[in-house]
Amino acid sequence: MPKQTSGKYEKILQAAIEVISEKGLDKASISDIVKKAGTAQGTFYLYFSSKNALIPAIAENLLTHTLDQIKGRLHGDEDFWTVLDILIDETFLITERHKDIIVLCYSGLAIDHSMEKWETIYQPYYSWLEKIINKAIANHEVTEGINSKWTARTIINLVENTAERFYIGFEQDENVEVYKKEIFTFLKRSLGTA
């Protein structure tokens, strides 16, 4: 398979996001996607084996964007709680902006029975947060003795689930800032040193 960072790959992926968002996965055709991308149909198959193969790529693209946005707001000297606050804020912002794509990814990955692909896609995000947690443990910002690998996954899942429930499930009995503050407070009480 050609390098995924090529311009054609990105064009096809962005075109797929637009076409699938507009028409839905079932009604979107590969012809529609390549026409929007300005590439030949054969080029599509250099990168993707089928239309369903787009879904993990779209999910990975969105997750990479999320992590890049979080890292882009960091300077490297922030304490754990500042990083967590930024992670929460960016997750909510990206979930609001891309809720249709998130729903598409969930449905597509469920259809393809590829939940194990989620773990592979999430691995860089989990590893990044795990390192942040290990640094926080060393700096006595969080409770010692926690399993940083498990804690990283739990934090990411909790924050994403809450953002998705707010924007996709419309559980909006409070203002979004209340939700973000509650997650932050819950995690600080759970992980903070006394």
Swiss-Prot record:
DNA-binding region location: 29-48
PANTHER family assigned to the protein according to its UniProt record, in alphabetical order: ACREF/ENVCD OPERON REPRESSOR-RELATED, TRANSCRIPTIONAL REGULATOR, TETR FAMILY
GO CC term (a single one): protein-DNA complex
Gene that this polypeptide is encoded by: yvdT
UniProt-recorded name of the protein: Uncharacterized HTH-type transcriptional regulator YvdT
One function term, GO molecular function aspect: DNA binding
Membrane-spanning parts: none
Transcription is among the record's keywords: yes
